[in-house]
Amino acid sequence: MESKALLLVALGMWFQSLTATRGGVAAADRGGDFIDIESKFALRTPEDTAEDTCHLIPGVTESVANCHFNHSSKTFVVIHGWTVTGMYESWVPKLVAALYKREPDSNVIVVDWLSRAQQHYPVSAGYTKLVGKDVAKFINWMAEEFHYPLDNVHLLGYSLGAHAAGIAGSLTNKKVNRITGLDPAGPNFEYAEAPSRLSPDDADFVDVLHTFTRGSPGRSIGIQKPVGHVDIYPNGGTFQPGCNIGEAIRVIAERGLGDVDQLVKCSHERSIHLFIDSLLNEENPSKAYRCNSKEAFEKGLCLSCRKNRCNNLGYEINKVRAKRSSKMYLKTRSQMPYKVFHYQVKIHFSGTESDTQTNQAFEISLYGTVAESENIPFTLPEVSANKTYSFLIYTEVDIGELLMLKLKWKSDSYFSWSDWWSSPGFAIEKIRVKAGETQKKVIFCSREKVSHLQKGKASVVFVKCHDKSLNKKSG
């Protein structure tokens, strides 16, 4: 009996030590202010971006030296989002590696709140306040204990982690330099007050990428409203290229159901990969443009860089703090590198056609000094005589300075007796093109005085006008 009693006492002491320690350090040794911190702070290394091999423990000063924290460099704090598996997702080491490649001497800390993030979504959403408090306590401790400047701190939060980052920023003794929200979660936060979610007040500068806002407000995976100083909506912020239903069916057919969860979060997670792209391809940042609506952007009406109307996506963003949040838009490719080249095209259709034709399909081909991009499809909602139409197109390659273009009006997909009897057509004298990335405006003229574009017929060629006054650079 005595041996059993001793065993029970020993087990009790062992269990008590487990509940009072974290990272191998007794809670009492950490100080009373830090006992309630459940989140873990792993300083990952360039050599091992996938494992949490060394933890910075609030209240334990030697842990900072043991992990070789660099006090003279930037610090990135990465905060993950909700998880089904209770494990880190594959993007975490990719982001860590990209941060170290861009800033080799920096500190990249990964916040582990997996046990709280694995609960039912509403429960995990509620835990973001506690996680934010944990992160704020850690940052305040680093600032007070080691005089580490918060100007060197950049928080990066994905999904629920974006709101945890915002709450952390609101609770630090001084503002951190920057918070990047990577598609902040929508449910439970779309209508939340600023103190409970990411907001512009949470850091000196807050930039946000919105990549999966499809659905009604409050039900979309990503938050729809702007919550930063600069809010960027790639491809309108709804679905991302390569993440559509057709792609899902193809992947399921090829690989089975194992990758379904990846497809569901494809657009949501694209925010992370866009930011990674900005770290790895610093020479060619993607450019976004301020616009009142995505509909106006699709018409090509917003490709201006005057008065901070355009900005870089991702790490090299210009830290413009407007009085109110600015919504910015851009197109991207379906895979890295994501950068594309935007063009506004304006065409005036002249003629005697009395009918208005709807949903008309066209193709345009651009030819430049470096490359060419042919048969770019676009659709005009309506086409009428003696009206000017503006629309947006983009190329996946840099074609250089524009020299020539071709325009084709495609036949309807259905048979039309009127088109068979007499193809409708318009006279076009000039086509105006503005390049978003270079801000150059070019006017293209018909080789003859006027070109006649007919539905279902051959392409019409336009060349750069000779009058130099017509071709200029505009802000």
Swiss-Prot record:
UniProt name for this protein: Lipoprotein lipase
Active site feature: 159, 183, 268
Activity control: The apolipoprotein APOC2 acts as a coactivator of LPL activity. Ca(2+) binding promotes protein stability and formation of the active homodimer. Interaction with GPIHBP1 protects LPL against inactivation by ANGPTL4.
Subcellular location: Cell membrane; Secreted; Secreted, Extracellular space, Extracellular matrix
EC number(s) given by UniProt: 3.1.1.34
Residues covered by region (Important for interaction with lipoprotein particles): 417-421
PLAT domain: residues covered: 341-464
Effect after changing residue 241 to L: In chylomicronemia syndrome; no lipase activity
Keyword field: Calcium, Cell membrane, Chylomicron, Disease variant, Disulfide bond, Extracellular matrix, Glycoprotein, Heparin-binding, Hydrolase, Hyperlipidemia, Lipid degradation, Lipid metabolism, Membrane, Metal-binding, Nitration, Secreted, Signal, VLDL
Disulphide bonds in the chain: 54-67, 243-266, 291-310, 302-305, 445-465
Stretch list, region Interaction with GPIHBP1: 32-53, 443-467
